[in-house]
Curated annotation (Swiss-Prot):
Family in the record: Belongs to the Fe(2+)-trafficking protein family.
Pfam families: Iron_traffic
A GO biological process held by the record: cellular response to oxidative stress
Organism, as annotated: Alteromonas mediterranea (strain DSM 17117 / CIP 110805 / LMG 28347 / Deep ecotype)
PANTHER family found in the cross-reference section: FE(2+)-TRAFFICKING PROTEIN-RELATED
Protein name: Probable Fe(2+)-trafficking protein
């Protein structure tokens, strides 16, 4: 049976992540409060951010930048700015 969480991003009950995907306290917070659906949405945004900013994920500054954007997106409902991207109409 799938684990469910009240997703803070989507503001609804949804299937939770199968395991902690990110290390540390932030990872625990994500595991406890973010759904698979919201995590999948973040992964798409993350890919766009990495490409747009030409981030090298071996660099600590790039990882810190992405972590800041991830936390803001998942918990503070702050949409990352991706130049030239127009979200689809709902």
């Amino acid at each position: 049976m799938a684990r469910t969480v009240f997703c803070r991003k989507l503001q609804k009950e949804a299937d939770g992540l199968d395991f902690q995907l990110y290390p540390g306290e932030l990872g625990k917070r994500i595991f406890d409060n973010i759904s698979k659906e919201a995590w999948g949405e973040w992964q798409k945004k993350q890919t766009m951010l990495i490409n747009e900013h030409k981030l090298n994920m071996m660099e600590p500054n790039a990882r810190a930048f992405l972590e800041e954007k991830m936390s803001a997106y998942l918990f503070d409902d702050v949409e990352p700015t991706i130049e030239g991207y127009v979200p689809p109409e709902k």
